[in-house]
């Protein structure tokens, strides 16, 4: 039986070799297991999880080993010695696991283990290298297929905004103390702050889907969070993050419906069950969206130190809540 220890995070794309040198674990510390690709495959955000674990050690009184234990296969017996398995789905070329690994994963979850599938939600309209921050409350097709073979009787369900995960340690959105920049720079542009508070991350929540095993939340999937956890050796957030928000203006509803485009359209499910339609151009970021009400808005990207720091602070708070919730529930 897995012993769940009771206890009392910073993202641009960085690549590193998948294999890290194994070293002795920290005594009496909680160690996170991370699935890595095969030898020689580069992994994304190598500084992310260690940075998040250091943050939790500093801010929560928890004691985590800041070096994850990397395993190459889910049949590795060391998996069963630790309560949490972290998997960045963007690092995996595919998730078509052999049957013995599927059985090992089911056994791990049935015995009390917790699986966090970072980047387990991915919007097709964003392309391979872009993050995701709103709507599309559905797991990736390969995730759905994998767990149909492990728990055929179960489905992923969106976490409601009032779920305990969103308030188990941090609550709400970051404030000025989280931004780590000069006071006169801390205020976000009004259009950005309004969209964040009302639509992007309302009440400090995020798009998660989960699956329950034996009456507990045992599997959690989200859009990529690791991009917001990393810090460099000087304590600065890496990488810079931009915000994608939706903006409207007088005449948009009439003009955009008449505009021409040569890219694809993508339906994205919202948490209210309705669909947005995203319009794009080849090789470009999403351009505009038609919402279920008939309203049209454009996607606009904002960048800057205060925006990037705000995003990192938010993703770190969410990451912290995920791991603390997993340990205490």
Predicted regions and their residues:
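Aromatic-Pro/Gly-enriched surface loop or interdomain linker
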Residues: 20-84, 91-92, 226-227, 241-329
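Extracellular/periplasmic catalytic domains that process cell-envelope and extracellular macromolecules
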Residues: 23-27, 77-81, 101, 108-110, ...
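Acidic, glycine-rich loop-and-strand cores that form catalytic or ligand-binding grooves
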Residues: 143-209, 213-225, 252
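Extracytoplasmic/secreted envelope proteins and their assembly/folding machinery
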Residues: 46-53, 102, 106, 140, ...
């Amino acid at each position: 039986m897995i012993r769940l220890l009771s206890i009392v995070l910073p993202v641009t794309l960085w690549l590193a070799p998948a294999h890290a040198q194994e070293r002795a674990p920290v005594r009496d510390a909680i160690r996170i297991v991370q699935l890595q690709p095969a030898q020689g495959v580069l992994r994304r955000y190598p500084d992310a999880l260690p940075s998040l674990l250091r943050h939790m050690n500093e801010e929560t009184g928890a004691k985590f080993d800041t070096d994850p234990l990397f395993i190459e296969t889910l049949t590795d017996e060391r998996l069963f010695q630790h309560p949490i398995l972290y998997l960045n789905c963007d690092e995996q070329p595919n998730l078509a696991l052999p049957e013995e690994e599927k059985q090992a994963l089911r056994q791990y979850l049935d015995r009390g283990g917790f699986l966090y599938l970072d980047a387990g939600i991915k919007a097709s309209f964003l392309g391979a290298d872009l993050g995701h921050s709103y709507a599309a409350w559905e797991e990736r097709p390969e995730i759905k297929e994998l767990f149909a073979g492990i728990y055929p009787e179960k489905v992923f369900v969106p976490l409601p905004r009032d779920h305990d995960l969103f308030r188990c340690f941090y609550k709400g959105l970051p404030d000025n103390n989280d931004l780590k920049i000069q006071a006169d720079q801390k205020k976000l542009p009004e259009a950005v702050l309004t969209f964040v508070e009302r639509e992007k991350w309302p009440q400090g929540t995020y798009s998660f889907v989960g699956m329950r095993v034996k009456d507990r939340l045992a599997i959690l999937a989200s859009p990529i969070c690791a991009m917001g956890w990393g810090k460099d050796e000087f304590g600065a957030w890496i990488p810079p993050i931009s915000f994608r928000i939706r903006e409207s203006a007088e005449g948009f509803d009439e003009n955009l419906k008449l505009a021409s485009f040569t890219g694809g359209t993508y339906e994205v499910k919202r948490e209210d069950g309705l669909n947005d339609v995203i319009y794009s151009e080849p090789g470009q970021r999403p351009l505009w969206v038609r919402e279920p009400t008939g309203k049209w808005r454009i996607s606009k990207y904002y960048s800057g130190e205060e925006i990037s720091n705000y995003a990192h602070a938010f993703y770190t708070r969410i990451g912290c809540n995920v791991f603390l919730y997993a340990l205490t529930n």
